[in-house]
């Protein structure tokens, strides 16, 4: 699947200092030490392409983009994989509602997402695969789990054959990533795609591994499991393994994926006898009109609509930078006005052309400290006002080109 064209990367020499990132699993901020020396490997969960990119999506992929920029600045090569969930219930339901082929809907919305990412100057992943493209690999993994005795059937009245579930019992307690109690899990499992009360399941949190073919739905042949389509969680395991290998360094995504998706993706990998991710970094939720911004609620602010109405994409990035990536925050129309004023002041400051190594170092220090964009903006505001957040400039040989640093570290170009 075509992703998008990456922006030209500004030529800022690497600092060589490590990124320190909050790991959801441990609850601590620790340095990212690659499992493969010299190369950091990241996986970010992709969209289900049945609607346009909203600011909640943008916040997630902005955070992942900052991670790879920070890792690049630390002197590492970076390999990233990202999926597109183009075979899933919400997409199939939307296609049926609108009377279009599910493949056409997925293709059109994936193309729009790519346009939005390109406008926001997000670096494209090295591996970008849809579920439908990766179906052969997914089926191979599902059959491998069956061969290991980890899959069991549950009768489905509306299908010709049974659905298949992953038996989690052999691996002990669920929740290695989230650390949640069973009560916390049950509170959200059903609304996030689970079916804890389905008759015939061995465990309430056992995830759907292979859904039997239903009338009007796409289906593929999975040998002894019959025709059908994969469950959600196994898909990311397969695309990650194919793209960057298992285990990898950082799993990224929105905080609404901590449970069940990331807990259960890790459980699938463990069931295969392979570790999954070394660390987990999750971005907060963006709210609007008092609720989490989501397709199901319809309270969405779309990136492409803002851009088409004349909003500079760099203003959108500055809106996202104004909130720490792990924070939940509420969108208001005033966010754009404040960010537009910031961008204007930065462009005026860039025309001065003064050399400020301390500002560049302040930007780097903020980014490598758990992607602290709020602190970075404080340094940029001081620079724009003609001052410095870090004292006098004493080393004229140090990198001091603030616009280049903004581009390389934060993806912000001051070219108008």
Swiss-Prot record:
Catalytic activity, as annotated: 1D-myo-inositol 2-amino-2-deoxy-alpha-D-glucopyranoside + L-cysteine + ATP = 1D-myo-inositol 2-(L-cysteinylamino)-2-deoxy-alpha-D-glucopyranoside + AMP + diphosphate + H(+)
GO cellular component, one term: cytosol
InterPro entries found in the cross-reference section: Cys-tRNA/MSH_ligase, Mycothiol_ligase_MshC, Rossmann-like_a/b/a_fold, tRNA-synt_1_cat_dom
Motif ('KMSKS' region): 292-296
GO molecular function: ATP binding; cysteine-glucosaminylinositol ligase activity; cysteine-tRNA ligase activity; zinc ion binding
Positions of Zn(2+) binding: 45, 236, 261
Short motif 'HIGH' region, span: 47-57
Membrane-spanning intervals of the chain: none
Needed cofactors: Zn(2+)
Assigned EC number: 6.3.1.13
Chain positions recorded as L-cysteinyl-5'-AMP binding sites: 45-48, 60, 83-85, 232, 254-256, 286
A Gene Ontology BP annotation from the UniProt entry: cysteinyl-tRNA aminoacylation
Annotated cofactor note: Binds 1 zinc ion per subunit.
Motif interval(s): 'ERGGDP' region: 191-196
Keywords of the record: ATP-binding, Ligase, Metal-binding, Nucleotide-binding, Zinc
Source species, domain of life: Bacteria
UniProt subunit comment: Monomer.
Function: Catalyzes the ATP-dependent condensation of GlcN-Ins and L-cysteine to form L-Cys-GlcN-Ins.
Family: Belongs to the class-I aminoacyl-tRNA synthetase family. MshC subfamily.
Descriptive protein name: L-cysteine:1D-myo-inositol 2-amino-2-deoxy-alpha-D-glucopyranoside ligase
Name of the gene encoding the protein in the UniProt record: mshC
């Amino acid at each position: 699947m075509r992703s998008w064209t990456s922006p030209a990367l500004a030529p800022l020499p690497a600092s060589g200092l490590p990124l320190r990132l909050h790991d959801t699993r441990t609850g601590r901020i620790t340095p990212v030490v690659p499992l493969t020396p010299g190369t950091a490997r990241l996986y970010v969960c992709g969209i289900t392409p049945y609607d346009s990119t909203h600011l909640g999506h943008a916040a997630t992929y902005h955070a992942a983009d900052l991670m790879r920029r920070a890792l690049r600045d630390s002197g590492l090569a970076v390999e990233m994989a990202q999926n597109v969930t183009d075979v899933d219930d919400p997409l199939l339901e939307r296609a049926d509602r609108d009377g279009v082929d599910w493949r056409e809907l997925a293709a059109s919305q994936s193309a729009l997402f790519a346009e939005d990412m390109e406008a926001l100057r997000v670096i494209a992943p090295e591996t970008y695969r849809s579920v439908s493209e990766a179906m052969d690999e997914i089926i191979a993994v599902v059959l491998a789990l069956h061969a290991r005795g980890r899959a069991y059937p549950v009768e489905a009245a509306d299908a010709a054959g049974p659905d298949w579930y992953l038996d989690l019992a052999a691996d002990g307690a669920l929740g290695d990533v989230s650390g949640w109690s069973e009560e916390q899990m049950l509170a959200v499992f059903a609304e996030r795609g689970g079916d804890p009360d389905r008759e015939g399941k061995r465990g309430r949190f056992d995830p759907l591994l292979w859904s039997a073919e239903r009338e009007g739905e796409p289906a593929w042949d999975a040998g002894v499991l019959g025709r059908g389509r994969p469950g959600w969680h196994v898909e990311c395991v397969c695309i990650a393994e194919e793209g960057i290998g298992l285990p990898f360094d950082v799993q990224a995504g929105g905080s609404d994926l901590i449970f069940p998706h990331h807990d259960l993706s890790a459980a699938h990998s463990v069931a295969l006898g392979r570790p999954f991710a070394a660390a987990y970094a999750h971005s907060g939720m963006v709210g609007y009109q008092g609720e989490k911004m989501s397709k199901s609620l319809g309270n969405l602010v779309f990136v492409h609509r803002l851009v088409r109405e004349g909003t500079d994409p760099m203003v959108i990035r500055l809106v996202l930078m104004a909130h720490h990536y792990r924070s939940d925050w509420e969108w208001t129309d005033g966010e754009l006005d404040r960010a537009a004023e910031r961008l204007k002041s930065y462009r005026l400051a860039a025309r001065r052309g003064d050399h400020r190594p301390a500002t560049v170092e302040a930007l780097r220090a903020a980014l490598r400290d758990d992607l602290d964009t709020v602190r970075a903006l404080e340094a940029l505001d001081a620079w724009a006002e003609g001052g410095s957040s870090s004292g006098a400039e004493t080393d004229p040989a140090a990198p001091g080109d603030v616009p280049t640093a903004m581009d390389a570290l934060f993806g912000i170009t001051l070219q108008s």
